[in-house]
Curated annotation (Swiss-Prot):
Localization terms from the record: Cytoplasm; Nucleus; Mitochondrion
Protein name: Hexokinase-4
Effect of H50D: In PNDM1; loss of stability; loss of glucokinase activity; decreased affinity for glucose
Domain Hexokinase: 10-454
Impact when changing V226M: In MODY2; no effect on stability; decreased glucokinase activity; decreased affinity for glucose
Activity regulation summary: Subject to allosteric regulation. Low glucose and high fructose-6-phosphate triggers association with the inhibitor GCKR followed by sequestration in the nucleus.
Pathway(s) this gene product operates in, as recorded in its UniProt entry: Carbohydrate metabolism; hexose metabolism; Carbohydrate degradation; glycolysis; D-glyceraldehyde 3-phosphate and glycerone phosphate from D-glucose: step 1/4
UniProt note: pH dependence: Optimum pH is 6-8 with glucose as substrate. Optimum pH is 9-10 with glucosamine as substrate.
Disease affiliated with this protein: Maturity-onset diabetes of the young 2: A form of diabetes that is characterized by an autosomal dominant mode of inheritance, onset in childhood or early adulthood (usually before 25 years of age), a primary defect in insulin secretion and frequent insulin-independence at the beginning of the disease. Hyperinsulinemic hypoglycemia, familial, 3: A form of hyperinsulinemic hypoglycemia, a clinically and genetically heterogeneous disorder characterized by inappropriate insulin secretion from the pancreatic beta-cells in the presence of low blood glucose levels. HHF3 clinical features include loss of consciousness due to hypoglycemia, hypoglycemic coma, mental retardation due to repeated episodes of hypoglycemia, and seizures. HHF3 inheritance is autosomal dominant.
Outcome, altering E279Q: In MODY2; benign
Length: 465
């Protein structure tokens, strides 16, 4: 009897593995994704193909990295998701002549009506938060230079001027797309009239992360975010950046690689679950690469896999709870928690219980395998993109072996128990001629924006502006 049951459990697990095998990517698959990513990057950089390229390769006008001589107080704003952060950054000489960066910050959550109302409502709310922060720190009387981390696709015309191309991540505030974001912020500050600010720089969160990590390690020339969304930036040779005049030196390019796949480059790798996630998203047909990796989508992918296993009578005796059938019910943090389970399955059992399920031991094991399959594919897909960037940098610099540091931020990278190990191992397999160091950014977005502002202020002083 026991043997029969054991055989049935083994057969069930084997069927589960057959279904989950769809998520496995072979090294040849990853090399294919990497080569296609490089081709799209090239198209994004070139003037004649930029418009139709899915990977936009947006110039950021960040050319210099901090040298350690900029000092002063800077205000930093960070808008990239449902939370908005205001930070005071003091850049100065530390002990023994070292450079020191001290920060104080406060988080504000953005109400739904500000995210989806008008641009005026959104930026009025942001300036209200700045006003509140300055009151708390008794700094209303000071006109501070301000660095703005704005983590949406922007076409820069200068370091302090950028046109919002399109909202992502659930934002829909009308009247912002096609307009200068810094102008919208300046107008809102003017409307309030109770404080003055000098907006000197606007950067993407990947750029802010790279600059913040450069402060720790001067070989950091790539910034990457794996959180709600997924994106990367890197220092490109100016001669390859056709959208900006000049051939000397390097400029940081914001790849906006989340949109890779929007022209069909990933079609052969998309599964039924991916198509369902895409169809029910706020932007169907867009940001397809990001939807395979980002935390906004990972939990939902797992939920759809679990429903398939229920329908195949391989999980929960073929019956799903009402909660499990509800879109968004299986949160991405559950994926991390399930994979963090120590082996007694308590954590998995508790999560499934909150979803109205009474799982068996085998159910718990199957749910864990589903989570591992989805998150491992995410790590491997992400590795193909980064390997594409790094191999490109090595080739354009004609280096036999390139040493490089990548600064990384984002909740999936930082909080998932195995993502970074799987990701690092896969990147290294795909970049055999590179020695890569990964560092995690601390308060990256805010500190990085302030350091970019410090560079901009120093330049302005040198130019006598």
């Amino acid at each position: 009897m026991l043997d029969d049951r054991a055989r049935m459990e083994a057969a069930k697990k084997e069927k589960v593995e057959q279904i989950l095998a769809e998520f496995q990517l072979q090294e040849e698959d990853l090399k294919k994704v990497m080569r296609r990513m490089q081709k799209e990057m090239d198209r994004g950089l070139r003037l004649e193909t930029h418009e139709e390229a899915s990977v936009k390769m947006l110039p950021t006008y960040v050319r210099s990295t901090p040298e350690g001589s900029e000092v002063g107080d800077f205000l930093s704003l960070d808008l990239g998701g449902t939370n908005f952060r205001v930070m005071l950054v003091k850049v100065g000489e530390g002990e023994e002549g070292q450079w020191s960066v001290k920060t104080k910050h406060q988080m504000y959550s953005i109400p739904e009506d500000a995210m989806t109302g008008t641009a005026e409502m959104l930026f009025d709310y942001i300036s209200e938060c700045i006003s509140d922060f300055l009151d708390k720190h008794q700094m209303k009387h000071k006109k501070l230079p301000l660095g703005f981390t704005f983590s949406f696709p922007v076409r820069h015309e200068d370091i302090d001027k950028g046109i919002l191309l399109n909202w992502t991540k659930g934002f829909k505030a009308s009247g912002a797309e096609g307009n200068n974001v810094v102008g919208l912020l300046r107008d809102a500050i003017k409307r309030r009239g109770d404080f003055e600010m000098d907006v000197v720089a606007m950067v993407n969160d990947t750029v802010a992360t790279m600059i913040s990590c450069y402060y720790e390690d001067h070989q950091c020339e790539v910034g990457m975010i794996v959180g709600t969304g997924c994106n990367a930036c890197y220092m490109e040779e100016m001669q390859n950046v056709e959208l900006v005049e000049g051939d000397e030196g390097r400029m940081c390019v914001n790849t906006e690689w989340g949109a890779f796949g929007d022209s069909g480059e990933l079609d052969e790798f998309l599964l039924e679950y991916d198509r369902l996630v895409d169809e029910s998203s706020a932007n169907p047909g867009q940001q397809l690469y990001e939807k395979l990796i980002g935390g906004k989508y990972m939990g939902e992918l797992v939920r759809l896999v679990l429903l398939r296993l229920v329908d195949e009578n391989l999980l929960f005796h073929g019956e799903a709870s009402e909660q499990l059938r509800t879109r968004g019910a299986f949160e991405t943090r559950f994926v991390s928690q399930v994979e963090s389970d120590t082996g007694d399955r308590k954590q998995i059992y508790n999560i499934l219980s909150t979803l109205g399920l009474r799982p068996s031991t085998t159910d718990c094991d199957i749910v864990r395998r589903a989570c591992e399959s989805v998150s491992t594919r995410a790590a491997h897909m992400c590795s193909a993109g980064l390997a594409g960037v790094i191999n490109r940098m090595r080739e354009s610099r004609s280096e036999d072996v390139m040493r490089i540091t990548v600064g990384v931020d984002g909740s999936v990278y930082k909080l998932h128990p195995s993502f970074k190990e799987r990701f690092h191992a896969s990147v290294r397999r795909l970049t055999p001629s590179c020695e890569i160091t990964f560092i995690e950014s601390e308060e990256g977005s805010g500190r990085g924006a302030a350091l970019v502002s410090a560079v901009a202020c120093k330049k302005a002083c040198m130019l006598g502006q």
